[in-house]
């Protein structure tokens, strides 16, 4: 959600800002803007409703010169998408961009109006601009004004502030919304995502909760909310510079679907040794903590929640550990009973998901045994604040609809299951089967991807549909959930998923010739039960699309389409059966002409409630 880029240098920074915004487009937005100040203090601001390209065209028509600037892509929360609501916002010489939500913006707005300030937008961000302006009028430096203003804000914010009268400094503050500083030679940068800054630096400092940073061309000083200076470690990024390049693919989502075999290989690299899972990266004390685990609580949102749901079956059936999975936004607002020796596992692609972070922080107060983050972004808030962390190493994922982040999360979770089964002293064949399955997984997915044309042809049947139903049983039920989520996200078809055994309890009423029913049916002990559910749909004239192995015993007919799958090891079947559902959603969206990579109303990383 939303994107921030800032730069302070001797050279003109407008193109750096625009390129940074282009690299953040995947996060979702409805408007874009930037402001640049030259050495004499002349400020130029441009804002446009729509895509970054429209802003870039405006910058060509009205060239911006100056070595200090901030830029933003907005995803509307307070105030409709419009040019007047687009960032940056200005209060005389104070210029502000902001991600997040200021919960007390209304009383602050009234106070500032009483002091003579006029508001021209509907946004909560304009409150920050006027508030900093007011505090600066009370005396002191911009940093001192920001230190006085920030405690007055309630809510989540990542904000960057500049004063056109003093273009040698940027101020930034972070509470609940990520900011990262990029370190250069005689120039420095700031953004909401390190991907925005990879063209200009690979050295980064991640701001921590409550940090306030003062950035000049030659220095970065960081303070806590009391004004005391603090030190933050800088890291070298391992992200690829060309992560934002689609290459031969039409969309990022398509590229990321096809990257899954290599992404999973990267996830496994260095983690399997002598036929066992090796998670020594967790540190020397991890085994002691993990051996005490008697219960697992998983928190996640969206696609990550679905991966947690799959892993619940694994933790309980393979490692013998009770497991609960909860949507993070629900967990954080209810009173919950903590099970004895319960490990909190959080799942997030970005590591900045607001509700998941809040749930992690709450778990520390509630007395969980420990916390483990499974994440795709090293150095993210979730990773820094957890006791243990495992990286998925999927590479940058840009498409809003998650694909490779999901399958690599499942890969890491399955390795963790193997590790816990060994620590619990269970039969060594459990770990052996997991390792064997994971090692085979990349080639199995490559086999599946070779059948893309079959899925593409199948997608034609969905082009005029408004609803779809997905069914699965056991650990394939969450895969049905994920398939439905993918279809609704990018094709805008209303899709729901049910455990197939629930058909008689309501969903069967929906079945008719206009309701496509997608079934994931691998060869396992639930296949015969699933066949009975399929017959219930068939008897009522539903259009069935069944993904099953050749020897599963299904026969195609006018209303039952069998999509034959290659044989796959049972333990990795949930990961494998995800891929055809990703392809189906992608091709249906293509036919319907939707924006595959940036579907309406959605953002890649949800960093506010």
UniProtKB/Swiss-Prot annotation:
EC no. given is 2.6.1.16
Which is an annotated GO molecular function term of this record? glutamine-fructose-6-phosphate transaminase (isomerizing) activity
Residue span(s) of domain SIS: 286-426, 458-599
The protein's matches in InterPro entries, at most eight in alphabetical order, are given as: GATase_2_dom, GFAT, GFAT_N, GlmS/AgaS_SIS, GlmS/FrlB_SIS, Ntn_hydrolases_N, SIS_dom, SIS_dom_sf
Any one Pfam family here would be GATase_6
Give the EC class as a word: transferase
UniProtKB keywords: Aminotransferase, Cytoplasm, Glutamine amidotransferase, Repeat, Transferase
- The disulfide bridges present are none
Pinpoint the Glutamine amidotransferase type-2 domain residues.
2-218
Question: Which cellular compartments is it found in?
Answer: Cytoplasm
Q: Name one GO biological process term.
A: protein N-linked glycosylation
Q: Which GO terms describe its cellular component?
A: cytosol
Where, by residue number, is the active site? 2 (nucleophile), 604 (for fru-6p isomerization activity)
Q: Reaction(s) catalyzed by this protein?
A: D-fructose 6-phosphate + L-glutamine = D-glucosamine 6-phosphate + L-glutamate
Q: How does it assemble?
A: Homodimer.
Q: What task does this protein carry out?
A: Catalyzes the first step in hexosamine metabolism, converting fructose-6P into glucosamine-6P using glutamine as a nitrogen source.
Under HAMAP family, the record lists: GlmS
Q: What is this protein called?
A: Glutamine--fructose-6-phosphate aminotransferase [isomerizing]
Q: Which organism is it from?
A: Escherichia coli O157:H7
